[in-house]
Structure formats: C-alpha cells, structure tokens
Regions:
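HotDog/MaoC-like acyl-thioester-processing domains
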Residues: 1-14, 98-157
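A generic structural signal for short beta-strands and their flanking turns/coil linkers
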Residues: 15-17, 22, 30, 41, ...
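Catalytic strand-loop segment that frames the active site of acyl-thioester-processing enzymes
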Residues: 2-60, 151
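Hydrophobic beta-strand-centered segment that forms part of the acyl-chain substrate-binding groove
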Residues: 57-60, 67-112
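A broad, structure-centric signal for solvent-exposed, well-ordered loop/edge residues
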Residues: 20, 28, 33, 41, ...
Length: 157
C-alpha cells in the first residue's frame, strides 16, 4: 500500500520538474467501446475495415487518447499529492501516431513554470508540456496545457 502524501498546493510545486505516469494498455474492446460512444469511424469499430484504412489497423480515436492522457495525468499528479483541479486551456494539441490495440501508453509530464491565476485567487496555473508515448517510446500525442492547481494562500487578483 502506498503512503498518502501530504497535499501539495500551487505554491509548493517545484518547476521545472518532470513526472512519468503509470502505463495504460489499450485493448480492442476499449477502442471499440469509445468509438461506438463518441467517434464512430470504421477504423475505431471494425478490425477488418481498419486494415484497409489510412491507419492500417484498429486504432484509438484521438479523443480517446486525450481521455487516457487526462486519466494518466490526474492519477500521477494526485499520487504526488498535487492538488490538481483541471485544465484551464490547451493551447497546443497534436496527434502524431495512432494508438493501436494492445499498445501500452504513458504520459511524460514536464511542469515548466508557475503563474498566478488572475481571475481566481483560489488557484494557480502551471504550464506543462505533456507527451503521450507508446511502448516503443514514440510520441503518439503531444500537448501544452495550463494546469489549475489549488493555491494554499489567497493572493491579490
């Protein structure tokens, strides 16, 4: 059983720093279920149709990869004790390679710099670059995000 870490608020997060998430293996069932519910393209639903697609095989929706990244990010920040609230904005998002069935992905999180949230005294913003990588260490998706983290102390807006 892992020890619960003390809460880390925005003021206490060290930047720059690098975090690595756990891995998530993406099954054919995961891909098809997400595809049926949210992105019903043939290459997300049918293995045979996917073979003749531009991707050449059953692959996850880019939005599915985003959802996986969000879970990996949230779990990692929470496990570190960081009081993560969510994302303020995502100014950059790029899909690079497909995530195929049975690929194992993880997130490499670079916490770059901190700034006060001018619109809310309860939060601070941490700029982050996140790369989702597969088991071959290839980037499958990269993004820049502004993470909202609970602030310990109120500050002047």
């Amino acid at each position: 059983m892992s020890k619960i870490k003390r809460p880390i608020c925005w003021e206490d997060v060290t930047t720059p720093s690098r975090l690595i998430s756990d891995r998530k293996t993406v099954s054919a069932s995961d891909i098809k279920q997400f595809g049926m519910n949210f992105d019903p393209q043939p290459y997300h639903l049918d293995r045979d149709a996917a073979k003749t697609s531009i991707f050449g095989g059953l692959c996850a929706s880019g939005w599915h990869v985003c959802a996986i990244m969000m879970r990996l990010l949230s779990d990692k920040l929470t496990s570190e004790g960081i009081q993560f609230i969510g994302n303020d904005e995502i100014p950059k998002l790029k899909w690079i390679e497909p995530v195929f069935e049975d690929d194992s992905v993880y997130a490499e999180i670079q916490l770059k710099e901190k700034q006060r949230d001018p619109s809310n005294v309860d939060f601070g913003i941490i700029s982050a670059d996140i790369a989702v990588k597969n088991q071959r260490e290839s980037d499958v998706m990269v993004l820049s995000a502004e993470l909202l983290v609970k602030a310990r102390q109120h500050h002047d807006a």
